[in-house]
Amino acid sequence: MSLGLVGRKVGMTRVFAEDGQSIPVTVLDMSANRVTQIKTADTDGYNAVQVAYGSKKANRVLKAEAGHFAKAGVEAGRGLKEFTADAAKLAELKVGDTLTVELFQVGQLVDVTGTSQGKGFSGVIKRHNFSSNRASHGNSVTTRAPGSIGQAQDPGRVFPGKRMAGQYGNVKRTVQSLEVVRIDAERQLLLIKGSVPGSKGNDVVVLPAVKAGA
């Protein structure tokens, strides 16, 4: 993992390229990423930067958290996130600094991680893209049933990992190699080509793409 930012999904819109092409983009608000701690291999066993993101009411902050934020001299955040970084990058940062969208460049590929939208309890057709059974000719109650889920007496159980009905969505997902279309440094906005996981207002983590050179 390399240095990145934590932000919130604002929503989707579109922008027009110079040739008139309409490009669908997701707007991400990446403001208020404040460095709260710098970890080094000598003191912590690894190199990393801890950042606080978002904001939180003072009466909602635990005493331990309040002390940590006060020691760093930053406003209390909604949460903390660590990004690993090399020693050279750590030397450029200090506690209390603010990370901005200038970490990225237009045209750069990034990986975006978020929590996908929850769809509730869903059947196997919606959840796992199973095919439905026949809707007539003697089939009355098993049109959307999963079918056999295992053998009989031997082994007499359902194998772990069997695809069945259950909670659909609301899981951590990463979309890789999305292009940064525009950067609004004044409002700390990133416009990413395509869609990213989650609903409006959800937290997302943006990192340089792992497979950018592939």
Curated annotation (Swiss-Prot):
The keyword Transport does not apply. GO terms for biological process: translation. One of its GO terms (molecular function) is rRNA binding. Methylated by PrmB. It holds the Pfam family Ribosomal_L3. It comes from the Bacteria. Residues 132-145 have a biased composition (Polar residues). Belongs to the universal ribosomal protein uL3 family. Part of the 50S ribosomal subunit. Forms a cluster with proteins L14 and L19. This is Large ribosomal subunit protein uL3. It comes from Laribacter hongkongensis (strain HLHK9).
